[in-house]
Amino acid sequence: MDYFPVFLNIKQRNCLIVGGGSVAARKAKLLLRAGAHIHVVSPTINAEFTGLLQQFSSISHNAETFRPDHLQGRVLVIAATHDRATNQAVSVAARKAGIPVNVVDNPDLCTFIMPSILDRSPIIVAVSSGGGSPVLARLLRARLEALIPAAYGRLATYAAQFRGQVRQHFSRQENRRFFWEKMLQGPFAEMVFAGKDQAAQDYLLETLNNSVDQPPIGEVYLVGAGPGDPDLLTFRAMRLMQQADVVIYDRLVAPAILDMVRQDADRIYAGKERNRHTLPQTSINNLLIKLAQEGKRVLRLKGGDPFIFGRGGEEIETLSQHQIPFQVVPGITAASGVASYAGIPLTHRDYAHSCVFVTGHLKDNTVQLDWSALARPNQTIVVYMGLLGVSELCRQLIAHGLPKTTPAAIIQQGTTPNQCVLTGTLATLPTIIQENPLKPPTLIIVGEVVKLRQRLAWFNSTSESLGNTPGYSKHP
């Protein structure tokens, strides 16, 4: 983040606006809505400012040019003049005095910037582009206007009104949170939105009085995070990610996806890197049981799909043995997502009538697979976790009958801006990888369908920096 978002309490506090035009007037209106006392410094003011002075006793005007002593006693400063020298003087003086300052349309002179605001008081939504594109921030706010009805303000007011009663009824924080999640996403909220305020209050109180303050029942959410692009998450995955109390995640979960988990959820890194598991599988299973028995909603977040080389079956088998409630949310597996973003269809009527998923993990320095079954014509082979064993993989496929010229590709960090695709053949792929070191996660695709990439590639990543090497081609 270039800026840290905060909300300031400026009620009945002295703020300074330097400038008397329409932009300064708009800023004054925002500060007035927040309850500030505003002092305006400008030789002249427009009619809009004159109206504000007549309407509000909390705004005053000094018809002078700016001087540093105007900052005395101010907690916030906004400069909105057409004179660069004046704006810079305000910025320099405010910084020297340690007072937050905003210079309109000049981020370099600001110590804070003004977001685009959606006001559903007491709910406030602020959208900022970091000063890079105020127009984009306003467009995003316009979208939020349609998504967040004005009645959300009343909903928040009721939540504040009954907060004390709910706190008194439930001794456990988890129970209070569960209660409010139920209220704010169910019939109570719908009644408020429909204007049935009395019915909403009656429903809330009845539900509260009938609720028992018992230890909550824990649950585990086994969620597939997909191959990396956050846009590929399912709606169900998003919902469960937002209500989890704790998340246990693997190395292959993209940081952008982890950022979408509820912010105050505890985070536990499980590792799952080759030969370096931060938590062994048995420890993960035991931890899931322990946390769920404590009444927590546990998000077990796995890259791709939890049931495809993800050991998800082992985890829920353990949960079932201990009678722990669980849900499973499938994710887009890497074979499907990465191949699509690489422009490689896994099946095609002219090239491949079947597709096989295998794992390429080395065991005793060999890849133990049914090579005869893999080395069949008109078949696509997708190899997970095959980077270290790629030489053995290619050698065995050739030895069992696939031509050396069989097209092959390896994709690094597929579906993300860091995606990089290297294409070659079974004979050349190991050399290509040796000359262009890649970092996991990677996926290997072998078969005639790889040839289609030259025509079907559509996803343009931003990390295409490798040079051309004889014997292979690299595409974005």
UniProtKB/Swiss-Prot annotation:
The keyword Lyase applies. S-adenosyl-L-methionine binds at residues 227, 303-305, 308, 333-334, 385, 414. Residues 218-476 are annotated as: Uroporphyrinogen-III C-methyltransferase. Keywords: Cobalamin biosynthesis, Lyase, Methyltransferase, Multifunctional enzyme, NAD, Oxidoreductase, Phosphoprotein, Porphyrin biosynthesis, S-adenosyl-L-methionine, Transferase. NAD(+) binds at residues 22-23, 43-44. The keyword Ion transport does not apply. CDD domains: SUMT. Its EC number is 2.1.1.107, 1.3.1.76, 4.99.1.4. Residues 1-204 are annotated as: Precorrin-2 dehydrogenase /sirohydrochlorin ferrochelatase. The active site is at 250 (proton acceptor), 272 (proton donor). PROSITE patterns: SUMT_2 (PS00840). InterPro entries: 4pyrrol_Mease, 4pyrrol_Methylase_sf, 4pyrrole_Mease_sub1, 4pyrrole_Mease_sub2, CobA/CysG_C, NAD(P)-bd_dom_sf, Siro_Cobalamin_biosynth, Sirohaem_synt_dimer_dom_sf. It catalyses: uroporphyrinogen III + 2 S-adenosyl-L-methionine = precorrin-2 + 2 S-adenosyl-L-homocysteine + H(+); precorrin-2 + NAD(+) = sirohydrochlorin + NADH + 2 H(+); siroheme + 2 H(+) = sirohydrochlorin + Fe(2+). GO terms for molecular function: NAD binding; precorrin-2 dehydrogenase activity; sirohydrochlorin ferrochelatase activity; uroporphyrin-III C-methyltransferase activity. The modification Phosphoserine is found at residue 129. One of its GO terms (biological process) is methylation. Pathway: Cofactor biosynthesis; adenosylcobalamin biosynthesis; precorrin-2 from uroporphyrinogen III: step 1/1; Cofactor biosynthesis; adenosylcobalamin biosynthesis; sirohydrochlorin from precorrin-2: step 1/1; Porphyrin-containing compound metabolism; siroheme biosynthesis; precorrin-2 from uroporphyrinogen III: step 1/1; Porphyrin-containing compound metabolism; siroheme biosynthesis; siroheme from sirohydrochlorin: step 1/1. In the N-terminal section; belongs to the precorrin-2 dehydrogenase / sirohydrochlorin ferrochelatase family. In the C-terminal section; belongs to the precorrin methyltransferase family. Then it catalyzes the NAD-dependent ring dehydrogenation of precorrin-2 to yield sirohydrochlorin. Finally, it catalyzes the ferrochelation of sirohydrochlorin to yield siroheme. This is Siroheme synthase. It comes from Nitrosomonas eutropha (strain DSM 101675 / C91 / Nm57).
